[in-house]
C-alpha cells in the first residue's frame, strides 16, 4: 500500500509522469496506490495527505522524504525566491512531513523514516559554487540526524539514502548537462532497491545511518 503525494497532477514535458501515472504503474505491479495532490510548502495540504493515507490504509508504517527542489546557481545568480523555495521544500518539508506522520508511525510495529539526502560532510567542495542548494539539502540530513537521536528510543528508524553517483532522472537531464551526462549515471532502480533493503529491516536499532 503506497500513497504518492506530490504537485505533479498534469504532464510536464520536462519531467515525465504524474502522481496518477505513477500509481497506475504500482497497481499494474500488484500494489495498492493512492495519488494525493499536495504542495509540501503548505502545512494543511501535507496534514490532509497524511490523514487520507492513514484512513485509506489503516495507518502509516513508512515515510519517504523524496520531495526536493534543486538550483545549482552560485550566490551571484541565485535569487532569494529560489533560495527560499529550496528551503521550504527540502529542509522544512522533511521536518514537516516527519512531524505530521509521527502520531501514526508511533502506532506501527516497524516504523521507518527515510530521507533522500547526503551524508554530512563539511568539506568546502560540497558547498561551492552551489551553496544555496547544499545548505537546503544538508538541512534534510540534519533532520535525519536529530530525529534519529530523538525517535530512536521510540523504536522509529530514521535514516538517509544518497546515491554514490548521479542518477538518470529528468532533473539530471534538465539541470546537470543533458543527455551527455546520462551515460555516466546509474539507473533509478538502484535507489529503489536500496530503499527497499533499508525499509524491510527491523526498525529497532537501525537508525541514524547515512546510506550510500
Predicted regions, residues:
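Active-site loop of short-chain dehydrogenase/reductase
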Residues: 30-32, 59-60, 105-119, 153-157, ...
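Hydrophobic positions on the long internal alpha-helix
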Residues: 49, 64, 97-101, 105, ...
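Short-chain dehydrogenase/reductase
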Residues: 1-57, 70-71
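Catalytic loop of short-chain dehydrogenase/reductase
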Residues: 106, 112-153, 165
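A short helix-coil junction within the Rossmann-fold of NAD(P)-dependent oxidoreductases
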Residues: 56-57, 73-74, 100-109, 123, ...
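C-terminal helical subdomain
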Residues: 160-161, 178-212
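Substrate-binding pocket helix/loop in short-chain dehydrogenase/reductase
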Residues: 74-75, 82-84
Amino acid at each position: 500500500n503506497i500513497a504518492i503525494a506530490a504537485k505533479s497532477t498534469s504532464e510536464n514535458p520536462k519531467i515525465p509522469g504524474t502522481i496518477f501515472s505513477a500509481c497506475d504503474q504500482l497497481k499494474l505491479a500488484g500494489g495498492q496506490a493512492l495519488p494525493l495532490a499536495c504542495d509540501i510548502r503548505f502545512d494543511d495540504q501535507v496534514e490532509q495527505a497524511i490523514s487520507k493515507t492513514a484512513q485509506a490504509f489503516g495507518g502509516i508504517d513508512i515515510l519517504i522524504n523524496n520531495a526536493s527542489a534543486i538550483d545549482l546557481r552560485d550566490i551571484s545568480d541565485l535569487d532569494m525566491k529560489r533560495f527560499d523555495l529550496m528551503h521550504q521544500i527540502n529542509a522544512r518539508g522533511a521536518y514537516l512531513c516527519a512531524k505530521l506522520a509521527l502520531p501514526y508511525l508511533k502506532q506501527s510495529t516497524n516504523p521507518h523514516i527515510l530521507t533522500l539526502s547526503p551524508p554530512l560532510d563539511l568539506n568546502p567542495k560540497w558547498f561551492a559554487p552551489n551553496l544555496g542548494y547544499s545548505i537546503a539539502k544538508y538541512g534534510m540530513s540534519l533532520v535525519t540526524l536529530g530525529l534519529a537521536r530523538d525517535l530512536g528510543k521510540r523504536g522509529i528508524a530514521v535514516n538517509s539514502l544518497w546515491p554514490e553517483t548521479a542518477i538518470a532522472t529528468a532533473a539530471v537531464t534538465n539541470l546537470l548537462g543533458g543527455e551527455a551526462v546520462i551515460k555516466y549515471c546509474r539507473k533509478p532502480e538502484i535507489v529503489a532497491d536500496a530503499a527497499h533493503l533499508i525499509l524491510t529491516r527491523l526498525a529497532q536499532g537501525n537508525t541514524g545511518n547515512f546510506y550510500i
